[in-house]
Amino acid sequence: ASFIKLAQVLATRADFFTLDYLEELKSLHDKLPPMSHEEFERVYAEAFHGVNFEQFKQEPIASASIGQVHVAYFEGQKLAVKLRRYNIQAQVKADIAIISFFNRLFRPLFSHYTKNSIEAVIIEFSKMILQEVNMSTELHNLQKFSSIYPTSGIKFPTPLVGLCSEHALVMSFEEGFRF
């Protein structure tokens, strides 16, 4: 999961790769298969013990490196539910260790500027992805952006805070487009 996320980050760095490589890296957005049924059941049980959704669609509408998004209904409201992948925190920590190892291994082969640039990307990436695997961080960010831009004309989803946790972000379902 972390390697796909790193590729997504690197896809924004024209100083590292040619346009051909950047296009290939960009194609990795949201291309992961969904969790297995067993993994989904474990994550769902951990996130929602005691919560009774009127309906919860097990087939995700999106599946990415950190989590997947499902449609659910609660008290008559259509919701988007982002569940983090099973065991993702441990996976991410192991991935960071591997990425750091390879960076140390290949560091002598890079120019001075590239060494420092790659090092900075890895450090920033490690911080970012460790925060991103916690859905409580996403909840906080959603609330922060909503409060900063209340009159921007941008429709932010409304979180159902009582249903959110480090495992799941539950919010109103908003139609939109991807850019």
Predicted regions: what they are:
Residues A1-F179:
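Broad phosphate/nucleotide-binding scaffolds in NTP-utilizing and phosphate-metabolizing enzymes
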